[in-house]
Amino acid sequence: MGKIKKLPEHVIGKIAAGEVVAGPYSVVKELVENSLDAGATKIEIEIKSGGKSYIKVKDNGEGMGREDLLLSIYEHTTSKINDFDDIYNLSSFGFRGEALASIAKVSRIVITSNNGSESHRLEAIGGKIKSVNEYPLVEKGTIVEVYDLFFNVPARRKFLKSEATEKRYVVEYVEKFLLSNPDVEFIFRADNEIIYNARASNLEERFKLIFPEVKEYTLINGKYVEGIISSPNYHRKNRTGQIFFVQKRFVMDKMLYYIFENGYGEALVDHPYGVLFINVPSKLVDVNVHPQKLEVKFSNPNIIYSDITRTVREALKKFVSKQIFVKPINEKKTKSEVSSFETKNVNFSNDSFQDKFNSVFKESVNHVDYSKNMLFDISEKNLEVKNDVVILKKRYVLFEMEDGIYIMDFHAAHERVIYEQILEKLKVGIEKIDLIIPIEIKVGKSLKQIVIEKLDELKENGFEIKVENESVKILSIPSFIKPSDVDDIFKEIIDEYRIPSMGTKNMKHIIADKACKSAVRTGYDITEGEAKKLIEEVFKRNLTTCPHGRPLFLKITFNEIDKYFDRT
């Protein structure tokens, strides 16, 4: 008998469901999209236990009759398209006929619907209909209730996150619907707590609701893009404040992130906030390239990208008095931008000098082994700095050691030393400062959920916090953090946890990383004495990179210098 065999239908169904249903948040996503496609103007969402045990979505849409209700939980049944070409003229969210079918296969589901002339309730377990009966539903619309998600796929259920984390994922997705559909009323409850009660309004009001920390923003309106963006003064360390929609579908597209930030040009600090709606004719965009429709393809992307950059740049004139330099989208770095030495002011009559220098310099740089995150072993060096140090462009320190010449980035070095000092304090025990006046920080709902998730861990690391409805109050802080820095540092610490890959990162390292921002900056007038002390501290601790992995030193050995001067 051959080794290849056809999988049973129930196995195929569960595997396929996994492509659509990643967790409670994706159930909410699919059900809310169905409600919007049904023309709902009011949608109520409720979850319990992070959505693991119960999810409910109720709408006032057009509803379904008995015949449609029976077909709704079977795969590839849809009212949106008739043949493949219809995909390129879509105005709805759903079209594959997979969502309800996939959800039904991995849960116990109850659907109650009234289309204005008849009302029925369907109950199914694991994708199999158990009953369909007439049911008195007073209001026109549909109620979908999902119980015990992944009850029949224990391996998938095992990999769900904690209830608090799954709840946060749902909150974040609900926020995307609030932004993309400001004209729809949303009520969202979690474990009997009202998270959002958002009346129909407009984008500006919804933006303020989701991002209360942003005080400077402006609406934008281009040929293909519209939305709302923050001033350069408001930004995050990651792109969680950037939410993009194409035809009102939420998308995650690296190129769109880049193009948006490109519009900020030289005004860019970190990652600004932005809610963008890209509107193009349906036939010019393909949404059928990702199982969860998170990616899109444009038939002519350059005109879209140019419009985004131009529109953002024009809008920012409201905030930035000086002219913003916007790099061309496809601009490549020139040699002068990537070279470690500037040579434009040096005029050598003999080109061979520069060629020879570049050859030796390249050889010294090639000694760096980034894979080991180590430039060279400094643990056994004589820590004495020979002669005086030289400060270069208020950025670098040049000094001589026994084996060569070193150039050190003093900001990166100071940052790493502070990072190590803070880690040492955190490991020994936290010394806290009780604040006479608590520091109140405005946060959105999803950030508040992260604080709740990490409350105990934050307390262990020196932050005493009281969570309130629209804000968090910080009652005590670690002694090494200045009260004036608390707002920025705390937001950055919490923001780290919005990125799933950061969830496993030790909070002590995150706090140390953020707190070391007090390091001297490039441009600081560092004295020779300060520079020598910093060099000694770095060598004593055997440090070679900053907390983010960038090298602290460039080293050119005397052997390499001798080689250049033909003294070998």
From Swiss-Prot:
InterPro entries: DNA_mismatch_repair_CS, DNA_mismatch_repair_MutL, DNA_mismatch_S5_2-like, HATPase_C_sf, MutL/Mlh/PMS, MutL/Mlh/Pms-like, MutL_C, MutL_C_dimsub. GO terms for molecular function: ATP binding; ATP hydrolysis activity; ATP-dependent DNA damage sensor activity; mismatched DNA binding. Gene3D superfamilies: 3.30.230.10, Histidine kinase-like ATPase, C-terminal domain, MutL, C-terminal domain, dimerisation subdomain, MutL, C-terminal domain, regulatory subdomain. GO terms for cellular component: mismatch repair complex. The keyword DNA repair applies. GO terms for biological process: mismatch repair. Keywords: DNA damage, DNA repair. Signal peptide: none annotated. It comes from the Bacteria. This protein is involved in the repair of mismatches in DNA. It is required for dam-dependent methyl-directed DNA mismatch repair. May act as a 'molecular matchmaker', a protein that promotes the formation of a stable complex between two or more DNA-binding proteins in an ATP-dependent manner without itself being part of a final effector complex. Belongs to the DNA mismatch repair MutL/HexB family. This is DNA mismatch repair protein MutL. It comes from Thermosipho africanus (strain TCF52B). The lineage of its organism: Bacteria, Thermotogati, Thermotogota, Thermotogae, Thermotogales.
